[in-house]
Regions:
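Flexible internal linker/loop segments at domain or repeat junctions
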Residues: 112-158
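Flexible loop/turn segments at secondary-structure boundaries
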Residues: 94-98, 118-124, 161-162, 183-187, ...
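Peripheral docking tails and interdomain loops at the edges
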Residues: 187, 192-241
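Extended, charge-rich low-complexity interaction segments
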Residues: 6-13, 140-160, 234-241
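A charged, amphipathic alpha-helical module
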Residues: 1-123, 153
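A short, acidic, amphipathic alpha-helical segment used as a generic capping/interface helix at domain edges
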Residues: 155-172, 190
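A polyampholytic, Gly/Pro-enriched intrinsically disordered region
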Residues: 1, 131-142, 224-239
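Acidic beta-strand-to-loop metal/phosphate-binding motif
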Residues: 173-182
Length: 241
């Protein structure tokens, strides 16, 4: 085991220059289009792109991602913003883009994806500092900046709330949807506290749901999402009160 680990460590060291050469922020650049008042990409489309980028060999998918990025720079959005609200989606893993599509068909665009397999914080650039190997940089990043809900100390909890608040501000979200997959206890605890913090202390409307791994109980979820979106619309009409 030690020999295998040492060989892998050597590979990381050897590939530092390769990492720097291939370093790319294409997914981040594509995702940033969602910050626009009338984005040229939907949350569902971005979810598909993000998922594909995680399961396809990079050397095969990068040319297509670069092509997509260039297309989005000249893509004309709908004449009028086609959604009734903008939301940040936070929580357990969501590897089914149909879940994002469900939210958007209810009337809310998912402008930021802060969940397991999402681009926040999964697509954050890992800085390789002077004198560090790629392996060291990855270890440092995950030990000091990991946003997983399994880290339960107060500093990490506050850090996660601050990051979601930052996303809501940057992407001009009207509200936040916290979801946890059934039996994911970490996000189950997180969403309860987050609902209180965001609703009562930060003044950001928050919806919390529990979901199965497979997209079931669609009618129930649709009812919850529609009611939440309606409450966001009412808040907009009342001037954010």
């Amino acid at each position: 085991v030690h020999s295998l680990f040492f060989l892998q460590y050597q590979d990381f060291c050897r590939h530092k220059k390769s990492c720097q050469f291939h370093d790319s922020a294409i997914i981040t650049e594509i995702g940033n289009f969602r910050k626009a008042d009338n984005p040229s990409i939907t949350g569902y489309e971005f979810h598909v792109i993000q998922l594909v980028s995680q399961v396809c060999p990079h050397r095969l998918i990068l040319p297509y991602l670069a092509e997509t990025l260039e297309e989005l720079k000249t893509r004309e959005p709908e004449p009028k913003f086609p959604f009734r609200a903008r939301v940040v989606l936070v929580g357990s893993e969501i590897d089914d883009p149909e879940f994002t599509k469900l939210i958007e068909t209810c009337g809310a665009m998912v402008v930021a994806d802060r969940y397991c397999f999402g681009s926040f914080p999964g697509r954050e650039q890992i800085e390789i500092r002077e004198g560090e190997t790629a392996f060291d940089a990855i270890c440092r990043h995950y030990l000091h900046w990991n946003q997983c809900a399994r880290f339960m100390d107060g500093m990490k909890i506050d850090q996660r709330h601050s990051e979601v608040k930052k996303l809501a501000d940057e992407f001009k979200a009207d509200g936040v949807i916290y979801e946890n997959m059934k039996f994911c206890e970490f996000w189950s605890y997180e969403k309860i506290l987050a609902h209180h913090i965001f609703t009562n202390e930060l003044g950001i409307p928050t919806c919390t749901i529990e979901k199965e791994y497979a997209l079931g109980a669609v009618g129930q979820l649709r009812t919850r999402f529609q009611a939440f979106i309606e409450s966001l619309e009412i808040k907009q009409i009342q001037g954010g009160k």
